[in-house]
């Protein structure tokens, strides 16, 4: 099973607050530089890495001289605003020493729930990866309340895995992995090497909340692994304090706990599209486009003869032949109004007709399910 991690091409690495801030003592430049070194080595092997980093609130608390995490929402948000500045600066310096550029992306759950914003975020992240940039993602704690109060970056890491169709989510924490019981209370607890992410017994094994510095505990990591598995991504929970955990995992070494998914990211995505989409309209296609869809290719504007219904970018639409038979369904890259302006036209005309081009196809093949 460890070959699943060894063969992964796109990975999400989530680093917890306790690691980033050395248990609340302040940002730990040496630790950040070490992760940057490992990620640079993985990039050199052809891996694509997205970093999800906690630590803004904890770093802000240290800068403001606060010992205890406050309960008032406005004070948490103030700490996040102060800490995010130092967090991004420290990461930028660390990665630049290893020849890598970084990009800051602050997300909320609303960004990933709204289809248009979801597609925009996905396009940006995929482009950054293609450019060789390391995206550094954090929750936008300054403007979001529910995420600070109830949320955690373990969940965000799983959502980002879905967003970019990652193969693997690696959660680095201050524990070696998942144990059969809380090792701080039960000396007989043993480390679980691997298992199915959807196995419900792991929730019972996970302990309570984390430290006063971090928000989540092991239970949030298990639930994040379950969420990632539904996107087809495997999850490894490992200690960020061990030597070279990322490189050792990439070499197939049995580090931490591997919770594996039952399907690939693309299979999971296709299943989700088939089961959950509510159609907002239809695209009527000609015979050539119908053959292309049957062959598993993307739908281009030139093959569309009619647009039915009113919908926004990111909506689910049916692809039908000229007799009305549904051939496929998927997520459309342009609104109904935009589709009407570019139908029957080659992709090269999109920018001239609209003044911009979001994507070269109306529906990408990865966002299509053949009926």
Curated annotation (Swiss-Prot):
Specify the enzyme's EC class, one word.
Answer: transferase
Q: What's a GO cellular component annotated to this UniProt protein? A: cytosol
| Superkingdom in the source lineage | Bacteria
Give any single GO term for biological process: L-proline biosynthetic process
One term of GO molecular function: ATP binding
Q: Which residues bind substrate?
A: 54, 141, 153
Q: Which InterPro entries match?
A: AceGlu_kinase-like_sf, Asp/Glu/Uridylate_kinase, G5K_ProB, Glu/AcGlu_kinase, Glu_5kinase, Glu_5kinase/COase_Synthase, Glutamate_5-kinase_CS, PUA
Any idea where the PUA domain is? 280-357
List UniProt keywords, sorted A-Z.
Amino-acid biosynthesis, ATP-binding, Cytoplasm, Kinase, Nucleotide-binding, Proline biosynthesis, Transferase
Q: Which pathway does this chain act in?
A: Amino-acid biosynthesis; L-proline biosynthesis; L-glutamate 5-semialdehyde from L-glutamate: step 1/2
Where in the cell does this protein reside?
Answer: Cytoplasm
Q: Which reaction does it catalyse?
A: L-glutamate + ATP = L-glutamyl 5-phosphate + ADP
Kindly give the PROSITE patterns that the UniProt entry links to this protein: GLUTAMATE_5_KINASE (PS00902), PUA (PS50890)
Q: What is its main location?
A: cytoplasm
A UniProt-annotated Pfam family: AA_kinase
Q: Which residues bind ATP?
A: 14, 173-174
Write down the EC number: 2.7.2.11
Task performed by this protein: Catalyzes the transfer of a phosphate group to glutamate to form L-glutamate 5-phosphate.
| NCBIfam families noted in UniProt | proB
- Homology family: Belongs to the glutamate 5-kinase family.
HAMAP family documented for this protein: ProB
Name of protein = Glutamate 5-kinase
């Amino acid at each position: 099973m460890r070959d699943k991690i060894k063969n992964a091409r796109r990975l999400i690495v989530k680093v917890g607050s306790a690691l980033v801030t050395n248990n609340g003592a302040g940002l730990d430049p040496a630790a950040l530089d070490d992760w940057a070194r490992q990620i640079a080595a993985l990039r050199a092997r052809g891996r694509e890495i997205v970093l999800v980093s906690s630590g803004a609130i904890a770093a802000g608390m240290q800068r403001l001289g606060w010992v205890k995490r406050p309960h008032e929402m406005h004070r948490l948000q103030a700490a996040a605003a102060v800490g995010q500045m130092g967090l991004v600066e420290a990461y930028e310096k660390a990665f630049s020493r290893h020849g890598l550029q970084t990009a800051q992306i602050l997300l909320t759950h609303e960004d990933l729930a709204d289809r248009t914003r979801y597609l925009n975020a996905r396009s940006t992240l995929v482009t950054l990866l293609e450019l060789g940039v390391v995206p550094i993602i954090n929750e936008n704690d300054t403007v979001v309340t529910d995420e600070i109060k109830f949320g955690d970056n373990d969940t965000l890491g799983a959502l980002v895995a879905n967003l970019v169709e990652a193969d693997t989510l690696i959660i680095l924490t201050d524990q070696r992995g998942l144990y059969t019981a809380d090792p701080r209370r039960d000396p007989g607890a043993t480390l679980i090497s691997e298992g199915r992410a959807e196995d419900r017994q792991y929730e019972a094994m996970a302990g309570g909340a984390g430290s006063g510095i971090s928000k989540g505990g092991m239970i949030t990591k298990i639930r994040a692994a379950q969420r990632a598995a539904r996107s087809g991504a495997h999850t490894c929970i490992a200690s960020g304090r061990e030597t070279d955990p990322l490189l050792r995992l990439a070499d197939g070494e049995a580090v931490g706990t591997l919770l594996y998914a039952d399907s690939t990211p693309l299979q999971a995505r296709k299943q989700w599209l088939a089961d959950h989409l509510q159609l907002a309209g239809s695209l009527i296609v000609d015979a050539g486009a119908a053959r292309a869809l049957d062959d598993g290719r993307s739908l281009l504007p030139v093959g569309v003869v009619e647009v039915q219904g009113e919908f926004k970018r990111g909506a689910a639409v049916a692809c039908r032949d000229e007799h009305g038979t549904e051939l496929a369904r998927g997520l459309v890259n342009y609104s109904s109004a935009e589709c009407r302006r570019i139908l029957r036209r080659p992709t090269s005309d999109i920018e001239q007709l609209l003044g911009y081009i979001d994507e070269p196809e109306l529906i990408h093949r990865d966002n299509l399910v053949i009926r």
